[in-house]
């Protein structure tokens, strides 16, 4: 095993335990980093599911996503691969989910019935993923996977994700670009000024850009139709508390066609997660993942997908690349910090008002943050080439 902690110049390594206040704030930063992707998934699925005119139910679905993400992140970091890796919804499941919702048999049914069929496919697929992990089939393939394979995989994950970040930032480049510039300034050039800047570059960049957008909204520069317009309407309309619970949308429905379609999403998720494990281990100073670590990670991702199916998130769970990028920018690879972030996800998943507050972050800011995150992921992937003996 090779421990990479000495080479990373980390502020906190994987087993380090920062002070309580720092742990909570850094955990909140992880929550904010994964917020955009997690929020985007139910918003994208709202039309196929039939929730576009049901803001209350859509809010419940969003809260369920965060609640389940917190549970699965705790499971993965405590008993799974034990890397400081955040678990959350995956874009790999979007295409098969949309296809399931579009089946002719579901054309004239309520959104709950569509959700039940999606849940059934996700639960069935999770059994497949758990089996792959428990039997060690994924780990056995690792003997054929080296740095020259991992490097382009991780780099392509980062590059592929730009299609989600760049268009969002591009809706208003002044604010999106400001977010990117602030993240670069805080993480690379101003980090020696104050320790808080060094620890929270992403959070500070989001808050600063958000404040700028809010000021221009108040001054009337950004009107309601403007991409950077900041409105508190969602916050006013949201209820205070609601605790998600299993089978809240009804009993899952199982079908062969839906299961087979969802398998494609699972395979893509597994391949992406293996690359994420290597990137996360490298950035957090952990040992290079071995066959056992990979098997446990995939097993617990399958368990996470099973939980997501039972609760009805309309999606599965996988490793979040953007949070791995956050580790690189903050140089904080502590497992405890990610676990704190998971607890925050669970708690705030029951507080509808808090989640509604962050829906007021303009999309250009979220897109700008993604561009910086995905750039870091791409760089980490290419850095694996240093281990290739040419």
PLM region spans:
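N-terminal signal-anchor module of multipass membrane proteins
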Residues: 1-84, 95-108
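Intrinsically disordered, low-complexity non-transmembrane regions of multi-pass membrane transporters
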Residues: 1-25, 221-247, 283-286
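Membrane-embedded helical hairpins/re-entrant loop segments and their flanking transmembrane helices
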Residues: 20, 46-79, 260-335
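Hydrophobic alpha-helical transmembrane segments of multi-pass membrane proteins
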Residues: 28-35, 145, 149, 170, ...
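Flexible hinge motifs at transmembrane-helix junctions and intramembrane kinks/re-entrant loops
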Residues: 53-57, 173-174, 182-260, 265-275, ...
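Short, non-helical or kinked segments that cap or interrupt transmembrane helices
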Residues: 81-95, 142-150, 198-203, 314-322, ...
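Interfacial segments of multi-pass membrane proteins
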Residues: 98-102, 323-333, 337, 344-348
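Membrane-embedded alpha-helical modules
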Residues: 112-219, 340-390
């Amino acid at each position: 095993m090779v421990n990479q902690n000495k080479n990373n110049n980390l502020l906190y390594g994987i087993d380090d335990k920062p002070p309580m206040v720092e742990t909570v704030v850094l955990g909140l930063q992880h929550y904010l980093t994964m917020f955009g992707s997690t929020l985007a998934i139910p918003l994208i699925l709202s039309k196929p599911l039939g929730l576009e005119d049901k803001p209350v139910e859509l809010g419940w679905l969003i809260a369920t996503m965060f609640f389940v993400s917190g549970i699965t992140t705790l499971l993965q970091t405590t008993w799974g691969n034990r890397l400081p890796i955040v678990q959350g919804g995956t874009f790999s499941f979007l295409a098969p989910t949309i296809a399931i919702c579009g089946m002719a048999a579901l054309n004239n049914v309520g959104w709950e019935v569509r959700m039940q069929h999606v849940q059934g496919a996700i639960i069935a697929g999770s059994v497949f993923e758990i089996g792959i992990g428990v039997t060690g089939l994924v780990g056995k393939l690792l003997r054929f996977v080296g740095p020259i394979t991992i490097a382009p995989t991780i780099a392509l994950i980062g590059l592929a994700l730009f299609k989600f970040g760049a268009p969002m930032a591009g809706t208003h480049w002044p604010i999106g670009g400001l977010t990117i510039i602030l993240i670069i300034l805080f993480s690379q050039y101003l980090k020696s000024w104050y320790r808080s800047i060094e620890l929270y570059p992403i959070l500070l960049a989001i808050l600063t850009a958000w404040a700028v957008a809010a000021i221009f909204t108040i001054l009337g520069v950004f009107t309601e139709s403007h991409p950077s317009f900041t409105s508190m309407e969602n916050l006013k309309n949201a209820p205070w508390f609601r605790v998600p619970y299993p089978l809240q949308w009804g009993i899952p429905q199982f079908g062969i066609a839906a299961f087979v379609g969802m398998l494609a999403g699972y395979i893509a998720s597994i391949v992406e997660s293996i690359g994420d494990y290597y990137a996360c281990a490298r950035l957090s100073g952990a040992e290079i993942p071995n066959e056992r670590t990979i098997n446990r990670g995939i097993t617990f991702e399958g368990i996470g997908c099973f939980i997501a199916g039972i609760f009805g998130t309309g999606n599965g769970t996988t490793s979040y690349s953007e949070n791995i990028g956050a580790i690189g920018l903050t140089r904080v690879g502590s497992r405890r910090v990610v676990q704190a972030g998971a607890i925050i996800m669970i708690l705030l998943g029951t507080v509808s008002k808090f989640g509604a507050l962050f829906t007021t972050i303009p999309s250009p800011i979220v897109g700008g943050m993604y561009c910086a995150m995905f750039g870091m992921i791409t760089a980490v992937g290419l850095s694996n080439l240093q281990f290739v003996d040419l």
